[in-house]
Amino acid sequence: MSLYHYFRPAQRSVFGDLMRDMAQMERQFTPVCRGSPSESSEIVNNDQKFAINLNVSQFKPEDLKINLDGHTLSIQGEQELKTEHGYSKKSFSRVILLPEDVDVGAVASNLSEDGKLSIEAPKKEAIQGRSIPIQQAPVEQKTSE
């Protein structure tokens, strides 16, 4: 007679309950996480521009901050909700290093009515190569004495 078979159904029941509870908790939190900036962002980097688009529909414009320090772009959102029944806080932060050929003086942002944050900057014009002529130094003449 083995005790292994005696305890095995109880073990299955405990882990089954645990897994079911974890799945239920995940289903409850999924709507909160859906649409967060981490899930829906797009970066465009081509010859004409650098752009990033984020879905920030869960944040008000006053909850968002965009900072530029050199070529480092920081995007932050923070929202707090206090009620008589509880407190909740949502936040996100993105730090993006802009390419060297981006015109950082022309970075602009736009927030659409449906909560799409768009940040764009044009690329600098490429410096055209040119030919540099070689100038010859004057030849010193030797004088004979």
Swiss-Prot record:
Q: List the disulfide bonds.
A: none
Q: Name one GO molecular function term.
A: unfolded protein binding
UniProtKB keywords = Stress response
UniProt-listed Gene3D superfamilies: 2.60.40.790
List the induction conditions: By heat stress.
Determine the domain of life of the protein's source: Eukaryota
Name the chain's protein.
Heat shock protein Hsp-16.1/Hsp-16.11
Q: Which organism is it from?
A: Caenorhabditis elegans
Q: Per UniProt, what is the name of the gene that codes for the protein in this document?
A: hsp-16.1
